[in-house]
Curated annotation (Swiss-Prot):
Its EC number is 7.1.1.-. This is NADH-quinone oxidoreductase subunit K. Its main location: membrane. NDH-1 shuttles electrons from NADH, via FMN and iron-sulfur (Fe-S) centers, to quinones in the respiratory chain. The immediate electron acceptor for the enzyme in this species is believed to be a menaquinone. Couples the redox reaction to proton translocation (for every two electrons transferred, four hydrogen ions are translocated across the cytoplasmic membrane), and thus conserves the redox energy in a proton gradient. It is a multi-pass membrane protein.
Length: 99
């Protein structure tokens, strides 16, 4: 398969994720959209690594997955805290974490 197809797919997935971040108000949907954007970047990194025959893109993708895993833990913890206090997972309710 042509590497251009993988890059087009990565661009499409990134665009869907960016649209989800900009258009949705639910914190969980925004969170999933950010994860889509990170996975699209990983696909592009791995595609470029495959095209050039080195492992740099795969190493970057691995570290991005590690960061995304920690982001899931912290992000879901924050979303659950907002939900417990406001009974809503809306992005507009994030001001509850202010002092």
């Amino acid at each position: 398969m042509n590497p251009d197809n993988y890059l087009y797919l990565a661009a499409l997935i990134f665009t869907i994720g960016a649209a989800g971040v900009m258009l949705r108000r639910n914190a969980i949907v925004v969170f999933m959209s950010v994860e889509l954007m990170l996975n699209a970047a990983n696909l592009a990194f791995v595609t470029f690594a495959r095209m050039h025959g080195n492992l740099d893109g795969q190493v970057i993708a691995f570290f991005t997955m590690v960061v995304a895993a920690t982001e899931v833990v912290v992000g879901l913890g924050i979303i659950m805290t907002i939900f417990r206090t406001r009974r809503s997972a809306s992005v507009d309710d994030a001001d509850v974490l202010k002092f």
